[in-house]
């Protein structure tokens, strides 16, 4: 059983060559590649006096942040912590969830929720900053309406897929990075002493002496916010392509940052009133650079939107998020479209734009959430290194160094909380609460599923099959078995077959679903429990694979029929002689929680919130990819109150006359 579609383009992403490197530029580096649009501007607006020591110190911080955070942590370490080629915080968690640390899921959902929050602010700030460049040509242009129009188009086209434009992202980003590097290099020539910023001494002096060091660090951190994308996109492009491309990208970025710094030192009186990014552009290239910046902002936005869809798809299979309707607008493997999330993101981005109005105010909201994501990734990487047998000393040194660095950045970004950082923290907090409630509620539901030994019921199921006094319910009856222990079955499933309405069928199929720690696993095993009557199928599904049970079961059945392990021809003579297969019917056992069933207030609150959150999801039959015309849903109460209460009979004693 194999995953259905896989684009030839995607297949070649991992090959190291010009095409692979070009595609990597478009997929991976959109976010970090647009940072020069706003980083230097943010530094200048921290309130620190603009002079050579300030600019050299800030540039030194940028260079060494890119080196320590992006190059060493992500390119050299994190990209090696792959899950069968896939990267990202949830893929890393999937590798570690079998560890004894039961609370480790908290790190994953904190990191994922803040990463998703960052995905809402990124399109807003990148597109707004790019369009603001038009003000240098015509100060009266309506920036907000133009920005909203572009954002609307970006989110609208998601429903059609981005296969065609996605192939051109790399072709577009190559000249973008060359533009960054070349214009930066020309500007450096006007102030060669700016190259002293490579010396970390200037960063240390600035942080030691500046009273605004925390504000400067908060602005500097914006240069590496796209580093998490390098890790998340590992599965799309491969480690070697990302590592090689990063060498080129980092060089172009540093040249541009240095060029902006050189321009600032040559134009100190006017530096605060303009964006240095556009100021270093020759007048003849200004309009072209604005168009290029807008295009790069669109690429960055598209990468964040696609990344959000992928993260939530993984979260669904890891039981962190309710199942939602997922569409595949193209045949490209892994390209998803989640309509409700697309709409929610669009509304969120529009609110951010209308709330903050300009990129300078958005900078305050940017960076805080992604700092938390990076800190969670560091902690998970520490567990990963330990699980792989890396020296305890090296593991402690790695975790200690990066926890310290990222805690400093977190502290610096907290200074922006009241100015706008509260926005992404609020969004991330809501997403975390939803994930936490979902995880806890799912554990409660699983805990109170009563399981019984299946072999105790072989005989009665066989008897029901041959009892012609019972109306035939279906030729093939399929149940999803939620019992966790091998050899057991959900008692409500047995109740459905035997007690509620005895269901006679030719074949009974019990489907057990196990979500694997690997991304693309799609396998099954089949056990015949009662010959020609009862079968147990276990499907092993990777965390990036949608559980389309109806499709997979059809493939399994075709495989079993071809190997002559089962005969599914209809038992009706008129159909059997024409080799017509029997029909299938799925029974879904849906447990309904009633708050009064438990005296535990915490569980009541969790389950009530769970019921509210589940409303954004789809029902079980759609979540499992079942043909709804073949599905019967049976609702049963979820009993959590396990207290031993009994009803006493009132004995009435007749009075003797």
Question: Which ranges hold each PLM region?
Answer:
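The structured alpha-helical core of multi-pass membrane proteins
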Residues: 2-657
